[in-house]
Amino acid sequence: MRVDLNSDLGESFGRYKLGLDEEVMKYITSANVACGWHAGDPLVMRKTVRLAKENDVQVGAHPGYPDLMGFGRRYMKLTPEEARNYILYQVGALYAFAKAEGLELQHVKPHGALYNAMVKEEDLARAVIEGILDFDKDLILVTLSNSRVADIAEEMGLKVAHEVFADRAYNPDGTLVPRGRPGAVIEDKEEIAERVISMVKDGGIRAINGEWVDLKVDTICVHGDNPKAVEITSYIRKVLEEEGVKIVPMKEFIR
């Protein structure tokens, strides 16, 4: 059994410092690097790509809405043309830094409100996927496990990594409980580890109301901006490996 560990990194910009990138990078296999619109800047992007290279971590683009003030967590209504070109612009920007460091991009994982909106809006999902295909048909789309987005991407010829979240509660329909609601974010590492093992070994998790939710797991997201990120990430990796799960980059098993 193989699984990828990913984290959203490179989300500092200017004098604003966010996340524990250097420490978290030691335990993950894939880094989702902010592309300057919801977070990140050219200096941070280059630094994060270089850090990934030093730790033998695969690099992926983490594009979002043009929303620095809201950290990309506020919904924006986009036309398909806007969405397609916003993705192409951001992925291309990160690719420049990857190429400068002698790396290729492995994947694309949309950020925040854009990620969630794609699950609800098929036209938006198609436009984002078209933007990725415009750039490189061999990239992997990281999206919500068992979502319609995954089906659409595969229908359009794009490889997919089904993603689950280690520290987030789920609704019965397989979507994430919004961050502002009680119980949405889980902070206890023991509980997080138990949930991750359930996802990987049992193929699902109990939703916030107790119902069972089936989940396919290719990659597990651990958030790098959590104050306990290093403790949680290292513990998740340790527990998974003790259960006989191999932690490897998604490109090694998603073809």
From Swiss-Prot:
GO BP annotations, alphabetical order: carbohydrate metabolic process
Protein name as annotated: 5-oxoprolinase subunit A
PANTHER family registered for this protein in UniProt: 5-OXOPROLINASE SUBUNIT A, UNCHARACTERIZED PROTEIN YBGL-RELATED
Keyword Hydrolase among UniProt keywords: yes
Gene: pxpA
Gene Ontology MF term list: 5-oxoprolinase (ATP-hydrolyzing) activity; ATP binding
Function (record text): Catalyzes the cleavage of 5-oxoproline to form L-glutamate coupled to the hydrolysis of ATP to ADP and inorganic phosphate.
Coiled-coil ranges per UniProt: none
The family this protein is said to belong to: Belongs to the LamB/PxpA family.
Record field: transmembrane: none
Lineage: Archaea, Methanobacteriati, Methanobacteriota, Thermococci, Thermococcales
CDD domains, per the entry: LamB_YcsF_like
Reactions catalysed according to its record: 5-oxo-L-proline + ATP + 2 H2O = L-glutamate + ADP + phosphate + H(+)
Keyword tags: ATP-binding, Hydrolase, Nucleotide-binding
Catalytic EC class: hydrolase
Pfam families: LamB_YcsF
Subunit organization: Forms a complex composed of PxpA, PxpB and PxpC.
Keyword Lyase assigned: no
Cross-referenced HAMAP family: PxpA (MF_00691)
Organism: Pyrococcus horikoshii (strain ATCC 700860 / DSM 12428 / JCM 9974 / NBRC 100139 / OT-3)
EC number(s) given by UniProt: 3.5.2.9
